[in-house]
């Protein structure tokens, strides 16, 4: 999933230079991928039988490999749009099924272990970035897509034996209704959290799509590709790291801190320039984008707001679709303005997180059922990971 979803970022500059892809078309391809991801995530959420099917998992893995290879076979933007749409949908299905299997098979293991498992997304980012870093001097944009497909085949063979958890129908409450939240104050906290997480979806995805291209504007191409490898390496331990901090500090405080750090990291290449700024930016971004999801989804589950994780994931996914569209008009002037816009949106998310801190109930709100059930199909980069949140051991809170 890390390869299929994120390899486009380091290949994008090669497609600009060698395939004649315009900046606007590049943003459209990114949007298509995020639309596909939302479609796949919704399918996994509302058709639970898909989540428990080994056939669906294996079909999605093979289809994702085919979508990567297909990118090298054409120069038609329309076909590319369809392929990236499919890659997004297949990535989401793989992720949702992997979450289900993870919760099933690691339920009795230490709570931090799922956090490390979600580091696989970071590993996929790092491996695909390293692949493009090597190929940019000896290959072309086509060979980069072919190589990413080969890498995906190798990872598919490793994941082939994964056993999804069979779908289980949730028992209704005594009244047959959805669990209710405890009142207006709970709605206020959830509204602030929803706004923060949706804004994060917009802001993070602009950087996640264009960071390498922005760095390559003023530095050698190898620096941009190397920075993307650092993003992946920093992402590997990030979920477990933020989950560990969550045992000492409140999620709203950590969410505010993570968003602030992320905004600084995103803005650095546009404000400072230079190799050091690019590499520091990559580390700060990689260390926070999965952690923010961990903290936000954990806070939503803690509030026990009905369908909290599903609603948060939907807002985040819509934000990811809007991000490239919002940034697209700025791309004619290069990518630095897009990064500044991204940082500004993430700062707005931090402001909403600051409002969330006011009166946030550190004990679970009274009069509510557990908000479990949502987390198992929470799609996000949205990556549910170990944070010790109520619904499941180490997983309903994930980025």
Annotate each language-model stretch with its function:
Residues 303-335, 342:
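A late C-terminal transmembrane helix in Major Facilitator Superfamily
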Residues 20, 52, 73-78, 107, ...:
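Helix-breaking motifs and short loop linkers at transmembrane-helix boundaries and internal kinks
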Residues 250-296:
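C-terminal transmembrane helical hairpin of 12-TM major facilitator-type secondary transporters
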Residues 9, 188-229, 236-237:
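Extracytoplasmic gate region of multi-pass secondary transporters
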Residues 77, 109, 115-164:
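Helix-loop-helix hairpin linking two adjacent transmembrane segments in secondary transporters
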Residues 40-53, 238-251, 331:
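Helix-to-loop junctions at the C-terminal end of transmembrane segments
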Residues 83-121:
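Cytoplasmic helix-loop-helix junction between adjacent transmembrane helices
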Residues 39-75:
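Conserved MFS/SLC helix-loop-helix module at the cytosolic interface between two early adjacent transmembrane helices
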């Amino acid at each position: 999933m890390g390869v299929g979803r994120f390899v486009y970022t380091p290949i994008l500059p090669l497609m600009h230079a060698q395939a004649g892809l315009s900046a606007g078309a590049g943003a459209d391809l990114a949007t298509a991928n995020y639309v596909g991801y939302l479609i796949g995530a919704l399918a996994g959420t509302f058709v639970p039988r898909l989540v428990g099917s080994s056939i669906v998992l294996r079909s999605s893995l093979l289809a994702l490999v085919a979508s990567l290879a297909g990118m090298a076979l054409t120069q038609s933007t329309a076909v590319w749009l369809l392929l990236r749409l499919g890659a997004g949908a297949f990535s989401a299905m793989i992720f949702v099924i992997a979450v289900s299997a993870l919760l099933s098979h690691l339920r009795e293991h230490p709570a931090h272990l799922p956090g490390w498992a979600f580091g696989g997304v970071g590993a996929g980012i790092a491996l695909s970035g390293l692949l493009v870093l090597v190929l940019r001097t000896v290959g072309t944009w086509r060979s980069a897509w072919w190589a990413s497909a080969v890498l995906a085949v190798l990872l598919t063979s490793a994941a082939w034996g994964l056993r999804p958890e069979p779908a289980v129908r949730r028992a209704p409450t005594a009244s047959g209704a959805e669990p209710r939240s405890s009142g207006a104050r709970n709605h206020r906290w959830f509204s602030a959290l929803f706004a923060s997480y949706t804004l994060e979806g917009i802001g993070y995805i602009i950087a996640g799509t264009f960071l390498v291209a922005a760095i390559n504007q003023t530095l050698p191409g190898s620096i941009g590709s190397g920075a993307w490898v650092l993003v992946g390496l920093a992402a590997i331990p990030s979920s477990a790291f933020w989950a560990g901090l969550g045992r000492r500090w409140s999620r709203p405080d950590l969410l505010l801190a993570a968003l602030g750090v992320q905004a600084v990291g995103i803005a650095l290449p546009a404000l400072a320039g230079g190799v050091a700024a690019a590499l520091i930016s990559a580390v700060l971004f990689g260390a926070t984008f999965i952690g923010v999801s961990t903290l936000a989804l954990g806070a939503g589950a803690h509030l026990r707001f009905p369908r909290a994780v599903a609603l948060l994931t939907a807002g985040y996914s819509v934000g990811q679709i809007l991000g490239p569209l919002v940034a697209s008009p700025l791309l004619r002037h290069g990518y630095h303005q897009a990064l500044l816009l991204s940082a500004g949106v993430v700062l707005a998310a931090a402001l909403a997180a600051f409002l969330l801190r006011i009166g946030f109930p550190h004990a679970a709100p009274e009069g509510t059922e557990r908000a479990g059930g949502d987390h198992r199909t929470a799609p996000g980069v949205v990556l549910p990971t170990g944070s010790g949140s109520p619904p499941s051991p180490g997983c309903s809170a994930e980025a």
